[in-house]
Amino acid sequence: MLGLALWAALLPTGAAAQDDAPPEPAVVATAEEVVAAAAVEEVVEQEGAAPTAESNAEAIAAVQTNADYVWTLVAAFLVFLMQAGFALVETGMTRAKNAVNICMKNLMDFSVGSLAFWLIGFGVMFGANSTGWFGTTGFMLSDYATDNDPWLFAFWIFQTVFAATAATIVSGAMAERTKFASYLLYSAFLTALVYPVFGSWAWGSLYQGGGWLEGRGFIDFAGSTVVHSVGGWAALAGAVVIGPRLGRYGPDGKPRAMPGHNLVLATLGVFLLWFGWFGFNPGSTTAASTDIAMIAVNTNLAGAAGAVAAMITAWTFLKKPDATMILNGALAGLVGITAGCANVTPLSSVVIGLLAGVIVVFSVLFFDRIRIDDPVGAISVHGVCGAWGTLAAGLFNAEGTSMAIMTTQLIGIVAAFVWAFGTMFVFFWIVKATVGLRVSAEEEAAGLDAFEHGNEAYGPDTFSATAAGLPA
């Protein structure tokens, strides 16, 4: 009995049993919760009160704004890299004796274009206007002195690299026979006036302007027409006025081969351009949003489809998978998707790219047949496929198409051709009649590197015309 009593006395009571029960697992905060709690404590310490919904919204908006700045600038830097891509493509697809000249034209396109766009072009394109035709404020970034909005700087650099892209398209179409000084005049004129005026019609409301074409609902998200077709039609005007290279066409009118001296350079250039397009199209959101993922996918699919389609088309009709056609096919697909990259499906992007790859092959052959000498196919890639891409943006619009949409797209395409080709045709004729547009036959035969710049890209025996079997 004594043992039982002792045992009973040692048993814990109900309350004691609860106190000695195993404790429940502690709740462990996540890293995000710790950071959030620390932020709240810091706000409380600094302001003496807990953050409100309004202050949280302001903080989130500030983060989004900074992200928009960063993405827009990164995209601008990617598009700037496209200048190197154009230089490599054009240099590789032309003869060695003109390599320095082509590189210098591309460099000066950006240099002269940046100054002209800062001085005049940006104000014409994005300045305030009440007519829908062109802006009249914001020259030399003067708006910053008025509103002190730093977004102006990010937006300006992004639009400047676009303007320079439109200008450099012409370089390839007029390669190997254009006076360097005359080309500089063209570059300034296009970036100061021709490109900005049409840009104001289609994109003016992106800043302070507003254009008649965008008022109709014109779809050109990243510039199949605004950038590429404007540059392509200017290239067509230049090629028509300056005429073909010496020896390009025989007495019977048939084209003679003048192969580029280094298709490896041209291929590297296409890779750089493709890479830069991931800034060109997704960057046109000018916002760090989830939309950039789909735009990047559409861009890539169209470029890939364009290359494959051009390869198959060339293989079928030319009996060889011609490298220049394949390279231009990739670029054609990228140009074609630029207008609709934000408003079509991935499947539609593939279709757009495939058709662009077919179109560019036949377009290059067509211009050769009518004796318009375009050494790199710039007119076909940018002018023709830019027009196709603009039509496709309306035709494959994910939200549906209509006769009104397609009519507006056609109006935009025709307006771009009439404005860019007409204006540049007159400009090139004036230059031709005054200071001269074309080098002499002697200079053209010897190469523009030596006569225009006093330089050589390669040693005298690196690319011997005799050894390589190339035309002089």
Regions found by a protein language model. Name each.
Residues 1, 12, 18-472:
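Hydrophobic alpha-helical transmembrane bundles of multi-pass membrane proteins
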Residues 2-6:
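Hydrophobic helical h-region of N-terminal Sec-dependent signal peptides
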Residues 8-10:
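Structural signal for alpha-helical transmembrane segments and their membrane-water exit/capping regions
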